[in-house]
Design a protein with these regions (language model features):
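ATP-dependent carboxylate-amine ligase
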Residues: 2-165
């Protein structure tokens, strides 16, 4: 991951957010379709000498058919999968996650996105790579018509700092 660490890219697109003292690395990516998620996970696999983890969700009021596909891609290409909320909009968040879990029944279901990031970061070991996917550069979480401040990169930095890794 050393070459990737020095790459200046587009915010929210394979954005390197944190290096952990234990040797793990964390990235944010906007991937929110099955193809995009597959591309990101496939691209990052060679950079994980340990496990490849992913935290992802599926947007509400959007293509419901892709939700199980997102889960399937995540479980096929990552070692550690957490399904979380990602702009549920007007839909019930737990139902959105349940549809993603159809494609990935062994994934962990952690609805609160900040908590999902906390859980994923706490699991990181030397050589692991974590991708937090779906929101990319977005600075809000849309729930029931309200946009609540939320930024994956900021949450990752907080989680790494609080975990002390």
């Amino acid at each position: 991951t050393r070459a990737l660490d020095n790459l200046e890219g587009v915010p929210g697109r394979l954005q390197h957010v944190a290096d952990c003292a234990n040797g793990a690395a964390v990235y944010v990516d906007y991937a929110h379709t099955p193809d995009a998620l597959a591309t990101v996970l496939t691209a990052m696999r060679p950079h994980a000498s340990g496990k490849l983890g992913v935290v992802f969700g599926c947007g509400g009021d959007r293509d419901k058919g892709k939700r199980p596909q997102m889960g399937q891609v995540a479980c096929e290409l990552a070692d550690d999968v957490i399904v979380t909320d990602d702009n549920p909009r007007s839909e019930e968040p737990s139902l959105i996650r349940a549809q993603a879990l159809v494609g990935c029944p062994d994934a962990d279901d952690v609805g609160d996105r900040a908590k999902a990031i906390d859980v994923a970061v706490a699991r990181l070991q030397a050589g692991d790579v974590l991708i937090v996917a779906g929101k990319g550069h977005e600075t809000g979480q849309t729930v029931k018509g309200e946009v609540r401040p939320f930024n994956d990169a900021d949450e990752i930095r907080r989680a790494v700092r609080e975990a002390g890794i």
